[in-house]
Amino acid sequence: MWMLVPIAFALKLLNVFLQPLGSVWSSLGPLFLQLRAASWLAGGERSRPLQDRREAGEPGRAEGEDGGDLPTTPTSVNYHFTRQCNYKCGFCFHTAKTSFVLPLEEAKKGLLMLKEAGMEKINFSGGEPFLQDRGEYLGRLVKFCKQELQLPSVSIVSNGSLIRERWFQKYGEYLDILAISCDSFDEQVNVLIGRGQGKKNHVENLQKLRTWCKEYRVAFKINSVINRFNVDEDMKEQITALNPVRWKVFQCLIIEGENSGEDALREAERFVISDEEFEAFLDRHKDVSCLVPESNQKMRDSYLILDEYMRFLNCRNGRKDPSKSILDVGVEEAIKFSGFDEKMFLKRGGKYVWSKADLKLDW
């Protein structure tokens, strides 16, 4: 049927040019509108952008017309833009193997590409993200993502030791969530783990950051890695007092080449706990309403991790295998090698109320 459209259009166009010149222009407009409508109908669903089809209810890995999968949507991305850190946590699984950090404009270019591919949430991590240019590099990325890309959620994971109030004054309005890593409320345990700050007290600093988050209207979150040195600790009282929007509790994870093996910068084997020990910790804290547990099984394939070169890291085989950079091959091609399990992402609660505008917090 649609093969007749070009023929009919050609005949009408010929007829137009046989008319006097004054009538030509008044006749061309309706003809082109007719052709555009015909082309849209012929294209049908195929003419609609991928993001529009997803918004209509089609899943991120829906089957395409040729039987293949549609590209994965990078809804939530963790961008580890630096590997450098001022702590030496023994179980760290993203260690300082390079000192590379992308030029700011290149990083912005990649973030724009991710937004165009469907990204809604960006989480900046490291290493320690506040280490680069004393937090200025991070602050500019945060502002860019919220103000120019208008992402629903912009978050940071930090050890908190380098954050100053002036950073909140300058960039706090653009940040939705600040997650601070705190594995213990016993300062001696923090020293054993590698979170020691010399004369600074990690727990006291945590309380100061909580106050700043409230003052500058940033949602406050705590991340804890449960390991051999804190697995028997009872944190209910302290977590309840700090009242974070989420308390993310991770089981200590082994990643070959990062915290285990010949080429690793850490030896995390002595920190590892069993699944049963992790479950016992969770059971002890089951009455903490903000608790969000993540076992090794839930963690491994349910995060989209972007490294300092903007390569997706595939952790499916217990190590980090990088894709090519999205800056070189684009998001759709690079994400094919991410090993991302979208079902597990949803199962672990990866999609939640992550914009401070929607959290309705009692500041």
Curated annotation (Swiss-Prot):
Cofactor binding summary note: Binds 1 [4Fe-4S] cluster. The cluster is coordinated with 3 cysteines and an exchangeable S-adenosyl-L-methionine.
Catalytic reaction equation(s): CTP + AH2 + S-adenosyl-L-methionine = 3'-deoxy-3',4'-didehydro-CTP + 5'-deoxyadenosine + L-methionine + A + H2O + H(+)
Mod. after translation: Acetylated by HAT1. HAT1-mediated acetylation of Lys-199 in turn recruits UBE4A that stimulates RSAD2 polyubiquitination leading to proteasomal degradation.
Amino acid composition bias (Basic and acidic residues), ranges on this chain: 46-64
Primary site of residence: endoplasmic reticulum
Enzyme class (EC, first level): lyase
Crosslink site: Glycyl lysine isopeptide (Lys-Gly) (interchain with G-Cter in ubiquitin): K208
Biological processes, Gene Ontology terms: CD4-positive, alpha-beta T cell activation; CD4-positive, alpha-beta T cell differentiation; defense response to virus; innate immune response; negative regulation of protein secretion; negative regulation of viral genome replication; positive regulation of immune response; positive regulation of T-helper 2 cell cytokine production
Cofactors named for this entry: [4Fe-4S] cluster
Recorded topology in the membrane: Peripheral membrane protein
Residue segments, region Disordered: 46-73
Enzyme Commission number(s): 4.2.-.-
Example of a GO cellular component annotation carried by this entry: Golgi apparatus
Name of the protein in question: S-adenosylmethionine-dependent nucleotide dehydratase RSAD2
Subcellular location: Endoplasmic reticulum membrane; Golgi apparatus; Endoplasmic reticulum; Lipid droplet
UniProt keyword list: 4Fe-4S, Acetylation, Antiviral defense, Endoplasmic reticulum, Golgi apparatus, Immunity, Innate immunity, Iron, Iron-sulfur, Isopeptide bond, Lipid droplet, Lyase, Membrane, Metal-binding, Mitochondrion, Mitochondrion inner membrane, Mitochondrion outer membrane, S-adenosyl-L-methionine, Ubl conjugation
Binding site for [4Fe-4S] cluster: C85, C89, C92
Modified residues (N6-acetyllysine): K199
Matches recorded under Gene3D superfamilies: Aldolase class I
GO MF term list: 4 iron, 4 sulfur cluster binding; lyase activity; metal ion binding
Stated role: Interferon-inducible antiviral protein which plays a major role in the cell antiviral state induced by type I and type II interferon. Catalyszes the conversion of cytidine triphosphate (CTP) to 3'-deoxy-3',4'-didehydro-CTP (ddhCTP) via a SAM-dependent radical mechanism. In turn, ddhCTP acts as a chain terminator for the RNA-dependent RNA polymerases from multiple viruses and directly inhibits viral replication. Therefore, inhibits a wide range of DNA and RNA viruses.
Induction notes from the record: By interferon type I, type II and LPS.
